[in-house]
C-alpha cells in the first residue's frame, strides 16, 4: 500500500473468519490460556469461538481495545459508519459495533446457542459470561431474560434464512433496485470485464490501475 501511494488513504481491516480448532481438541490448549484441561467446559469452547476484528484508520496515533459482542454480519455496518456512510437506506442486516445502541446478542447456528455480555448458552448449558460459572437453577427473572435473548437470537437467524433461502430481494422495489439476472454476472472472466470497464470509463476512471497508466501495482 505504501509503495502504491495508498497507505495514507486506506482503512485496513483484519478479521478472523472463524475459530481454528475443533471442540474435541480444545482442551489441549488449556495450559496456553491458564486453564485446566480436566475442568474444561462448554463455556471454554464458546469463548474460543471469538475471533479478532482489527481496524487501522489513517491518522490514528493511539489504538485501543473495545470490548463489545458482535458477529460477522456487523462488520459491514461498522465499516460503513467509520467511512461516514449513511446506511439507513441500505437493505442489509447487522449493526454498528461502535454504536451505543448496538444490541450485543451473538447467535450461533447451533440451536439455542448464543453469547451476550451477561449470559452464554452453549451445548445445552447456561453460563455467566463474565465469570464462566454455570447457571444450573436460574430464578424466574433470569429465566425470563434468557427466553427473551433466545427469542431475539432465533429471530436473527430466521430473518437471515428468509432473506437468503427465500430470495426476499425479489419483493423489494425501493431505491430503484431492478431484477437481478444471474446470467449478467460471470466471475470467470473478471479481469477481462474490469479492463472493459476501465476502457469504457476512459479519463473518468478513478481506479489506481488507471492512475498508473494501465500498470498494476501488484
Please identify what each model-predicted range represents:
Residues 1-218:
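Solvent-exposed soluble domains appended to multi-pass membrane proteins
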Amino acid at each position: 500500500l505504501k509503495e502504491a501511494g495508498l497507505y495514507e488513504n486506506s482503512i485496513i481491516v483484519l478479521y478472523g473468519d472463524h475459530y481454528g480448532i475443533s471442540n474435541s481438541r480444545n482442551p489441549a490448549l488449556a495450559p496456553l490460556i491458564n486453564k485446566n484441561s480436566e475442568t474444561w467446559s462448554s463455556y471454554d469452547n464458546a469463548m474460543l469461538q471469538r475471533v479478532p476484528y482489527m481496524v487501522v484508520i489513517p491518522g490514528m496515533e493511539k489504538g485501543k481495545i473495545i470490548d463489545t459482542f458482535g458477529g460477522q454480519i456487523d462488520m459491514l455496518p461498522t465499516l460503513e459508519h467509520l467511512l461516514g456512510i449513511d446506511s439507513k437506506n441500505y437493505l442489509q442486516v447487522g449493526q454498528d459495533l461502535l454504536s451505543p445502541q448496538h444490541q450485543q446478542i451473538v447467535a450461533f447456528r447451533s440451536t439455542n446457542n448464543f453469547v451476550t455480555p451477561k449470559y452464554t448458552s452453549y451445548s445445552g448449558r447456561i453460563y455467566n459470561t463474565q465469570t464462566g460459572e454455570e447457571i444450573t437453577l436460574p430464578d424466574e427473572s433470569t429465566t425470563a431474560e434468557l427466553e427473551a435473548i433466545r427469542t431475539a437470537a432465533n429471530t436473527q437467524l430466521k430473518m437471515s434464512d428468509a432473506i437468503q433461502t427465500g430470495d426476499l430481494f425479489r419483493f423489494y422495489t425501493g431505491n430503484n433496485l431492478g431484477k437481478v439476472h444471474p446470467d449478467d454476472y460471470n466471475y470467470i472472466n473478471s479481469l477481462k470485464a474490469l479492463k472493459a470497464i476501465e476502457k469504457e470509463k476512459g479519463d473518468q476512471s478513478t481506479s489506481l490501475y488507471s492512475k498508473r497508466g494501465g500498470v498494476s501495482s501488484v
